[in-house]
Amino acid sequence: MANVIVIGAQWGDEGKGKITDLLSRSADVVVRPQGGVNAGHTIVVQGQTFKLHLIPSGILYPETECIIGSGTVIDPKVLLEELGQLKSLNVATDNLFISQTAHITMPYHRLFDQASEQRRGEKKIGTTGRGIGPTYADKSERTGIRVVDLMNPDELQEKLEWTINYKNVILEKLYNLDPLDPKVVIEEYINYADQLRPYVIDSSLKIYEAIQERKNILFEGAQGTLLDLDHGTYPYVTSSNPIAGGACVGSGIGPTVIDRVIGVAKAYTTRVGEGPFPTELHGDIGQQLCDRGAEFGTTTGRRRRCGWFDAVIGRYAVRVNGLDCLAITKLDVLDELAEIKVCTAYELDGQTCHHFPSNASEFARCTPIYETLPGWQQSTENCRSLEDLPKEALDYLKFLAELMEVSIAIVSLGASRDQTIIVEDPIHGPKRALLDENGDPVTTHE
């Protein structure tokens, strides 16, 4: 039995969908703990591409139960569209469950998100405009609509009549937008409720029962460590906690039941939207990474900013998540490069900096300190073991593992399931050793 968290170790879009899909074959339950339709994951199975935002990747395994947890924010319209897409492709969805305490994204959330971002002008954050931040804001202000409210038409009508009238004042007075018609919105969401009702459960209880039955549970994180509300590049972050601790909160379980945490990182670095990005490449190499890596967002279609691998933020991800091992994705994107750079530290105001600065303005002033490695300039897409890899590619992976001080358990060389090298058992492998001041293992946290 193992309860495993899969976490993005960069700014999201690391390939968590594929890694979760791979690991789901041995999972009894897959849980999506946080985030909303701002997160997208792409899975390719036998040449067929599935693009999902809310539904866990494990849905493609008919025997795997999939849970949308209480820490998520759900846009019912998008969720029903995903369910329809899966059903049209003959993918069973009766193994999907939705937490009754997850919050609901409403039309006014989307309007607030888009209008607020527009008013920021040059100081925009770079949100997806899908209403995620305003939904989480209402959750914190205790004025949000939850799934359990959606299931009670009378209670929903009472809450929404008051809430929409209140939100209309903001729409009209602050943003100069047309008000919403409460009757139309209520009718729309009651219709959504009728369609989603069969899926709604007490998710925390179901997860607890699965733990008691010693089932294998996989927690699928959304976004990435550097987008965490508390530990990311604030204010250029998401509105939830994509780190490992957030998976426990968003699932309704305690941290002591987690056996292992797997971090997912690209062999280079990408970022969507605004915010500091020390290793960003603006020239031909950056464009080459974008083109070869098909770096366009699943949710928005926006071009992702591309740069060299940043081991400083990588080590930070290891620290704040307690990563036990790594999955490195898109190694094949680097196949054509004559040389590859890795950021090992920053220069900040004339000083060498080995740690991620919490202040965004300081982070923006960081200049990467690089170490240059030779490229391999041959295809790795058909490699299925470490022995198949060119020596330079293997050396590159070893260098990343040394810098991150954590082992690499999985190497992904393409979008398909079979384009993968399993280096060590990512689920039942050893826990990461605690190191003394000399870098030697002193104990393990069993």
Swiss-Prot record:
The keyword Cytoplasm applies. Its main location: cytoplasm. Homodimer. Its cofactor is Mg(2+). It comes from Crocosphaera subtropica (strain ATCC 51142 / BH68) (Cyanothece sp. (strain ATCC 51142)). Mg(2+) binds at residues 13, 40. It catalyses: IMP + L-aspartate + GTP = N(6)-(1,2-dicarboxyethyl)-AMP + GDP + phosphate + 2 H(+). The active site is at residues 13, 41. Plays an important role in the de novo pathway of purine nucleotide biosynthesis. Catalyzes the first committed step in the biosynthesis of AMP from IMP. GO terms for molecular function: adenylosuccinate synthase activity; GTP binding; magnesium ion binding. GO terms for biological process: 'de novo' AMP biosynthetic process; IMP metabolic process. It comes from the Bacteria. It is found in: Cytoplasm. This is Adenylosuccinate synthetase. Belongs to the adenylosuccinate synthetase family. Pathway: Purine metabolism; AMP biosynthesis via de novo pathway; AMP from IMP: step 1/2. The keyword Nucleotide-binding applies. It is an enzyme of class 6 (ligase). HAMAP family: Adenylosucc_synth (MF_00011).
